[in-house]
Amino acid sequence: MEHYPFKLHSEFEPQGDQPEAIQKIVNGVNEGKRHQTLLGATGTGKTFTMSNVIKQVGKPTLIIAHNKTLAGQLYSEFKEFFPENRVEYFVSYYDYYQPEAYVPSTDTFIEKDASINDEIDQLRHSATSALFERDDVIVIASVSCIYGLGNPEEYRDLVVSIRAGMEMDRSELLKKLVDVQYTRNDIDFRRGTFRVRGDVVEIFPASREEMCIRVEFFGDEIDRIREVNYLTGEVLRERDHFAIFPASHFVTREEKMKSAIQRIENELEERLAELNAENKLLEAQRLEQRTNYDLEMMREMGFCSGIENYSVHLTLRPMGSTPYTLLDYFGDDWLVMIDESHVTLPQIRGMYNGDRARKQVLVDHGFRLPSALDNRPLKFEEFEEKTKQLVYVSATPGPFELEHTDEMVQQIIRPTGLLDPKIEVRPTENQIDDLLGEIQDRIDRNERVLVTTLTKKMSEDLTIYLKEAGIKVNYLHSEIKTLERIEIIRDLRMGTYDVIVGINLLREGIDIPEVSLVVILDADKEGFLRSQRSLVQTIGRAARNSRGEVIMYGDKITDSMRYALDETERRRTIQEAYNEKHNITPTTINKKIHDVISATVENDETNEQQQTEVPKKMTKKEREKTIANIEKEMKQAAKDLDFEKATELRDMLFELKAEG
């Protein structure tokens, strides 16, 4: 394994309370602290702080986010901060995934159906191979990193290592490639395949995007190794050595495969005896037929559809033991950072039970062997055992972080000097007329307003009332498709609307600098949407504007409201003192309005991108043209590593195709 230091590229130096936060976390890691929490207010540069910690600590780092969009955003940011180091992306490679399931009440079996994103699969392979090649690796992952993966030792041991000048004939290399699940394809050359032309073998590694390896033989010796652009054939550079990692994470040696097949046959025999004893003849016949088909595929091809369900046998683990995951691909000394930990940790905790419930039904009705239950995500206790040092990052840490952290590392100061918003609590009497007056004030100043309610009916009624009063308003709710949701937020920023009304305005993408007023109706109704954390997060929506204010309507002050008021006031006091001491004037964040709604097409004459609005109703020809344009832009966004935009464009495609 090669050693490289982390090199952070940024035109900014840590400022405000960032230097102190960085030093505290670095000291904690060096002292061997297991749990640390960075309590960072919205907009204080938590990602930059995390980057500085990684640079100073110098350990391979896993950063876990709670969804693909957030992971993609972090990936783009860390790639910018560490262009000379290996920043990798590891999320579920399914664009669409329907797990196999059985509904006993209707006797319905749902086959597994999935669409695999080839680029994300390549990035997953890039991540695992990087962890074995270097120690300056940052992996940005979603919660899918706790799902089962192949044995890392087997994955590493089966690497095909080639050197210029080494003795190896062509047929020996081809056999080794087939053993690690590469397939020969002389026509359709793509990732995970190789092609043969005389004494030249070209291999397309599973972890690469555009580069393939050309191996030239002279008799029984490798004469030269070169990196080549697979499309143009251009030679990129000479290589003395190259390591070809397996094309699948579930790769198994031939002798192990034989042992695994024997174990599966033994388990099948035992399970059939159980089912027959219970007079479950249909289930027994179904299980025997399905399992024998899979076994035949394994003998002939070395793999089968759904091979992950036999992972406990393929890795020769005892039944019920902890599965291998991405966490096992890290060495002994590494760091975990959990972003938005108040959301991510509960997700990690809940994965096992949901997966278990679905698979148990499949096992009970003869669709799978009991060992399929061992192809699962980690239990939370197993996750804790596998991780040694964790840094939780959140503006509102949850109970787990509070319980396990001695002292919070706080980051309250914003580099822009922005303060937490002023909060005012007002009675509910005449609240709508009062709200109307406040909205009108903001419209006069060309500012925007967010209003959060507790119920769908309240949102709808309020939206109708405001429209009748002449306000440009729209309503955000869970039934609105991704395409429309992004369009509504963009239209708010552009001034098409002045107000957005919604129930839960905490989702990503609602940080809008133009918003100077956040209104919380029914603030005194305790519950999930009016809890301490929800209120603090909602208040944060007004923290991107120098005139940010929050109005809570309620007839009493609940414990959650009191906490949110006190916490915001505490932060404001710290921020004001810092600004006064350093003579800083708060300035509203200037955030570019990205065009994620329009498909862009390339103008041949000007070679510039122009916007093409997606019409509400389109002819079939127009729809096909729009779909082609969006697909083109989506692929370009993925190529530019702008996964957030690529994901949004993908969702637009799904919706346009569904409407067609």
Curated annotation (Swiss-Prot):
Q: Where does ATP bind?
A: G40, A41, T42, G43, T44, G45, K46, T47
Broad class of the protein's primary localization: cytoplasm
Where does motif Beta-hairpin map? 93-116
The subcellular location is: Cytoplasm
Q: Which SUPFAM superfamilies match?
A: C-terminal UvrC-binding domain of UvrB (SSF46600), P-loop containing nucleoside triphosphate hydrolases (SSF52540)
Q: What GO terms in the biological process aspect are recorded for it?
A: nucleotide-excision repair; SOS response
For the UVR domain, which residue ranges apply? 624-659
What GO molecular function terms would the record report?
ATP binding; ATP hydrolysis activity; DNA binding; excinuclease ABC activity
The cross-references to CDD domains, in alphabetical order and at most eight, read: DEXHc_UvrB, SF2_C_UvrB
Keyword Flavoprotein among UniProt keywords: no
Which residues belong to any copy of the Helicase C-terminal domain? 431-593
Oligomer status and interactors: Forms a heterotetramer with UvrA during the search for lesions. Interacts with UvrC in an incision complex.
Q: What name does UniProt use for this protein?
A: UvrABC system protein B
Q: Which organism is it from?
A: Staphylococcus saprophyticus subsp. saprophyticus (strain ATCC 15305 / DSM 20229 / NCIMB 8711 / NCTC 7292 / S-41)
